[in-house]
A protein has these predicted regions:
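An N-terminal assembly and electron-transfer interface module characteristic of large anaerobic redox
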Residues: 1-225
Length: 225
């Protein structure tokens, strides 16, 4: 690690501390990038390639990835346009995700909440988020319920702790950690996210979530219809 020419930091919290220490001890430069979303991933590749003076190779890679994955992304974007999403993740991932899903998928981020966010995370969230978006720091369950009632999201991008909670409200969630169906990084990964968001929002079983199966009359009526 100490022989590297460059440290590329994606998670600005844990790996950032390591990169700062390596810069202090060994003089290795630190470069921060985002790897979620097509626009941010392309920007990150350009930064890395510019550092090493291989811009042409970077542009060729970006062109190949766009040709391979952009048509699939556009298919999902057309069907997710205007979807209302709440993002409840760790501090750094808030500002990684909010603009990428809005710009690359046409999703409207209506609320955000962070765990373990630092001041710099808040500043980036404010800079990237749109005016009128609600932001909660270290929200509890009661605050989550209140904000859900207020903004009425179609889907929530979060972890299992909050995700399993909101399922009781019949609201789908996408596991932001990506270990169910991910990864969500890079061009292919962002298509995975688009796919999972589409499947969550357009799942035909959503309409059945609120039916009380103990009400036999309601079930019979549904079957007759």
């Amino acid at each position: 690690m100490h022989q590297a020419k460059l440290n590329v930091v994606n998670c600005a919290r844990s790996s950032g501390y390591i990169a700062n220490e390596l810069k202090k001890r060994y003089g290795i430069p630190r470069l921060d990038i985002d790897s979620w979303g097509f626009s941010y991933m392309a920007e990150g590749i350009r930064k890395i390639c510019a550092f090493f003076g291989i811009e042409d190779r970077g542009e060729a890679l970006i062109a190949d990835e766009y040709a391979k994955w952009k048509p699939q992304l556009d298919w999902y974007k057309e069907r997710l346009q205007g979807t209302r999403m709440a993002i409840w993740t760790g501090g750094p991932r808030l500002w990684h995700w909010t603009k990428s899903v809005e710009d690359d998928l046409g999703i409207q981020v209506v609320a955000m909440s962070s765990k373990f966010g630092h001041e710099e995370d808040f500043e980036k969230v404010i800079a990237r988020g749109k005016e009128g978006t609600y932001y909660i720091d270290d929200g509890n369950e009661l605050e989550f319920f209140e904000i859900i009632e207020l903004v009425k999201p179609d889907v929530i991008f979060t972890g299992p702790r909050v995700g399993e909670l909101v399922k009781k409200l019949h609201i789908p969630y996408v596991n932001g950690h990506g270990y169910h169906n991910g990864p969500y990084m890079s061009f292919e990964g962002f298509v995975n996210l688009a796919r999972d968001t589409y499947n969550a929002v357009h799942n035909p079983l959503r309409g059945l979530a609120g039916i009380d199966i103990r009400d036999k009359g309601q079930v019979q009526l549904k079957e007759a219809a």
